[in-house]
Amino acid sequence: MQEEVFNELAELALKGSGQAIPKSKSYLIEARLAAIARREGFGTMADLVHCLKSRANPVFAAEVASALVSKDTCFFRDRDALKRVVDDVLPKRLKASNTGRLKVWCAGGSTGQEAYSLAILLEDELPASLRGAKIDILSTDICKVSTETARVARYGHYEVQKGLSIHR
């Protein structure tokens, strides 16, 4: 892939999602955009970039940016971070709140496993300092397909097996 083409697509990923794609991972760009390029009839990634630059189509640009981002996720992917949120962050935020209500936003939440992991952890290991609190968890993502998967919370055997114990 030409360096200029890589730079344009990497910039689109960064602006559209906040995810940086290093030059060493340029093969990911081609792999992630292959289906879109075929569907749209582009022979090369340069043709796709030319289309993005010559025709202002925010819907298509968002689709390309969404295809570029990593969707690697699983339940309890970073259990230590989730524990810190439950044991430290949420109790401090609740103490600072006068409402007894907390809102947690999982930005870049992909298909929802992290948000559901947080909910499971809160259910299983609710600290005394959070009892009685109303906690809302919202997961968002730039990929509409991922957001819909999170909304319906229907996961296959592989997704469930990857991160959840047999006790859950």
Language model regions located:
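Extended basic-aromatic, gly/pro-enriched interface segments that bind polyanionic ligands
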Residues: 107, 128-168
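Short, internal active-site loops enriched in acidic
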Residues: 34-35, 110-112, 142-145
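Conserved class I S-adenosyl-L-methionine
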Residues: 98-118, 136-138
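Short, well-ordered amphipathic alpha-helices
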Residues: 84-93, 115-126
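Conserved strand-to-helix beginnings and helix N-cap segments that scaffold or border functional pockets
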Residues: 26, 79, 115-119, 151
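A short linear boundary/processing microfeature
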Residues: 54, 91, 124, 128, ...
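Conserved AdoMet
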Residues: 1-105
